[in-house]
Each structure stands twice: as structure tokens, then as C-alpha cells.
Swiss-Prot record:
Binding site for ATP: I10, G11, E12, G13, T14, Y15, G16, V17, V18, K33
BP terms from Gene Ontology: cell division; G2/M transition of mitotic cell cycle; mitotic G2 DNA damage checkpoint signaling; regulation of circadian rhythm
Record gene name: cdk1-a
Classification lineage: Eukaryota, Metazoa, Chordata, Craniata, Vertebrata
SUPFAM superfamilies: Protein kinase-like (PK-like)
Keywords: ATP-binding, Cell cycle, Cell division, Kinase, Mitosis, Nucleotide-binding, Nucleus, Phosphoprotein, Serine/threonine-protein kinase, Transferase
Residues at the catalytic site: D128
Protein name: Cyclin-dependent kinase 1-A
Length: 302
């Protein structure tokens, strides 16, 4: 830790306090995440250190770069590149009645998908995507933060400050207790974030797991084995769930054109096996008029 100076505390993350800091030798400004572990006495689990070390290899222009992993007094510090604004703060700063330009919505979604394709191709899931861990710079670049931390540390039910971890972006298979979920959980989250970037409002803002599920069911219809094979055998599925029919997404989501709504519907398909993959989503006609040459990484690398 001697190489870094703490400048100020900038927030509370899911796993602990986040500081703005500076690398003494180079002057580079960084974000320093102090990881607070459930069992402090036991120190940092070796599995967590292994997982985190792998994340240093995730180098992509749409992923916040993990620069360093440091230990001090059995505390783990993760050192990331610094970006001063997250998507949630940005959406909150837009004056009432105004919205993000439609081309920027498209560009942000495309970049988020590029970052996720890169990680999924390396078998890394995010599992906890939300506007707070999408960071933006002044040049229109958006980057995904906190990749792989869910696997390394688990997702706590409450954040360090006792705020409840948000359920708004969580895929229905996770909410229904599936243990065998995979990359489609991130695509669902990105779909809900897409709607929020366009409308400035969360698409499904439940305040408990059941409220979250019911908000999804009201909008999309209550799923059954016909639309989603084996959903009725998931741990938390109840035959007593109200049988909502579901309406059209366009009623809930203004500011997205026909192609955008088609892509959104494909990202919010109940059956994870039928949900569009991030790689296929990048090829959707919604992005046909996006100038990809100006994006930070328009080559999808395997």
C-alpha cells in the first residue's frame, strides 16, 4: 500500500469503502476498493485471491481495468483505473423532461454488450450489473466495473452500509432460485439497464424478491412451463402465483424505437436458453445506424 496515497473517500461499494487515490511514483489517479470480508478473522480466502488474480487479465476498453491487488493488515485492496461518474449519477443529473440522446443510448448499449461479450467469451459472469457499476467518461465511453467480484466474494444481501442490494436488474431465474444460471443473467440485466438509460426510470423496481417477480410478471405475463420449460420446478416458483397476462413493452418503455423494442424484448425472454446472447445482440438491426468506427473497441475479439 506504500505505493499509493489515499486522497478521499468516494463511496460505499457492495463490498466496502471506495477511495480515490494516487500512485506515488506515476501520479496516476486510481480507485481503491477496500474489501470488507464477512469473516475478518480468517483473512482473505485463497479462492478469492485466485479469482481476483484472473480478473487482471480482463483487459478491454469497456471494462474498468484492475491494476493491482494488494494486502494490508489482512485487508484486501483492489486498485482500479479511476472514472469519476457512474451511469446512475449521470441519469440523475439530467434535468426533468430531458433524456439521453438516442444515439448515445445506442452507443452505451453497444459498448456494454462489447464488454460483456469479452467477459463471457472468457467464461466470466458479472451477476450484479446495475447503473451504479457502469462508469462513464467525458468522451462517451462506458465501462463495466466490479466484474467477477460476485464469484470471488459472493453477493451479500446487504451492502456494507446495510443498504439492501438492489434486485431491480436481477434475472427471473435467479429470483426463482435457479442454481444453474449462466451468461443469460447478464443479458437480462443489460436489457433492464437499456430501458432505464432511455427512460431514466428503472423498468422493474421491486422492494422485495416477491415484489420484484410480480412487477416482471405483470409486465411480461406470469411464466409457466409452456413459455419457459421447467420454470415450475424451480425452487421458489409457486403454483399460487397470480396468472398475469402481460402487456406490451412499448407501454412501459417510451423513447425506444421499433428496432430497440424488438432487441429489448429478446433480452427479456423468460427462458434463458432462448434469450438473445450478447454476441448476437451486437448484430441486431437496432445498431445498423450506429457509427461503430468511433467506439473504443469495434472489433469483437475472441
Amino acid at each position: 500500500m506504500d505505493e499509493y496515497t489515499k486522497i478521499e473517500k468516494i463511496g460505499e461499494g457492495t463490498y466496502g469503502v471506495v477511495y480515490k487515490g494516487r500512485h506515488k511514483a506515476t501520479g496516476q489517479v486510481v480507485a481503491m476498493k477496500k474489501i470488507r470480508l464477512e469473516n475478518e478473522e480468517e483473512g482473505v480466502p485463497s479462492t478469492a485471491i485466485r479469482e481476483i488474480s484472473l480478473l487482471k487479465e480482463l483487459q478491454h476498453p469497456n471494462i474498468v481495468c484492475l491494476l493491482d491487488v494488494l494486502m494490508q493488515d489482512s485487508r484486501l485492496y483492489l486498485i482500479f483505473e479511476f472514472l469519476s461518474m457512474d451511469l446512475k449519477k449521470y441519469l440523475d443529473s439530467i434535468p426533468s423532461g430531458q433524456y439521453i440522446d438516442t444515439m448515445l443510448v445506442k452507443s452505451y448499449l453497444y459498448q456494454i454488450l462489447q464488454g460483456i461479450v469479452f467477459c463471457h467469451s472468457r467464461r466470466v459472469l458479472h451477476r450484479d450489473l446495475k447503473p451504479q457499476n457502469l462508469l462513464i467518461d467525458s468522451k462517451g465511453v462506458i465501462k463495466l466495473a466490479d466484474f467477477g467480484l460476485a464469484r470471488a466474494f459472493g453477493i451479500p444481501v446487504r451492502v456494507y452500509t446495510h443498504e439492501v442490494v438492489t434486485l431491480w436488474y436481477r434475472a427471473p431465474e435467479v429470483l426463482l432460485g435457479s442454481v444453474r444460471y449462466s451468461t443469460p443473467v447478464d443479458v437480462w440485466s443489460i436489457g433492464t439497464i437499456f430501458a432505464e438509460i432511455a427512460t431514466k426510470k428503472p423498468l422493474f423496481h421491486g422492494d422485495s424478491e416477491i415484489d420484484q417477480l410480480f412487477r416482471i410478471f405483470r409486465a411480461l405475463g406470469t411464466p409457466n412451463n409452456e413459455v419457459w420449460p421447467e420454470v415450475e420446478s424451480l425452487q421458489d416458483y409457486k403454483n399460487s402465483f397470480p396468472k398475469w397476462k402481460g402487456g406490451s413493452l412499448s407501454a412501459n418503455v417510451k423513447n425506444i424505437d421499433k428496432d430497440g423494442l424488438d432487441l429489448l424484448a429478446k433480452m427479456l425472454i423468460y427462458d434463458p436458453a432462448k434469450r438473445i446472447s450478447a454476441r448476437k445482440a451486437l448484430l441486431h438491426p437496432y445498431f445498423d445506424d450506429l457509427d461503430k468506427s468511433s467506439l473504443p473497441d469495434n472489433q469483437i475479439r475472441n
